Amino acid sequence: MAIAHAVLRIARPTDRLQAIAAMYCQGLGFTRLGEFENHQGFDGVMVGHPQHGYHLEFTHHRGVKVGQAPTQDHLLVFYLPSEDDWRDGCCRMLAAGFRRVTAYNPYWDQSGQTFEDLDGYRVVLQQRGWEA
């Protein structure tokens, strides 16, 4: 199936475009993959790892306020089987300005830590592998 080879972009709005992009680059070790200004009233920054099949896009619609995350259960989850990588990742998240929070769904606290960005969106670092 062709979709199995597609690149995934996860896009969301923010009122703090540059701060959020910097936060995710520092916290998750992402790089800025691209950006645009005033594209029909929208500014945006794409961040991720250049060789991976996914990236994040943060956008800001000029003159529009989007506010905070709609719920505490909007998550990005990253599985890190190595305990050393997981601990390093947790330290990077805090250094980048993410706030450690208790997960809305207690499942994520069993083997991971949940972090909240400036907009209230959450990232979970799970200290385990992913098995489909």
Model-derived features: where do they sit?
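Short, conserved charged micro-motifs
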Residues: 84-89
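Vicinal oxygen chelate
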Residues: 1-3, 9, 35, 90-132
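Core segments of cupin and vicinal oxygen chelate
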Residues: 12-54
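Short hydrophobic/aromatic beta-strand element in the GNAT-like acyltransferase core
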Residues: 44, 77, 112-114
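N-terminal beta-strand motif that seeds the catalytic metal site of vicinal oxygen chelate
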Residues: 1-21, 73-78, 129-132
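Short, charged/polar, Gly/Pro-enriched secondary-structure boundary elements
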Residues: 51-56, 119-123
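Exposed loop/turn and edge beta-strand positions of beta-sandwich/beta-sheet ligand-binding modules
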Residues: 41, 72, 109
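Acetyl-CoA-dependent GNAT
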Residues: 59-64, 127-130
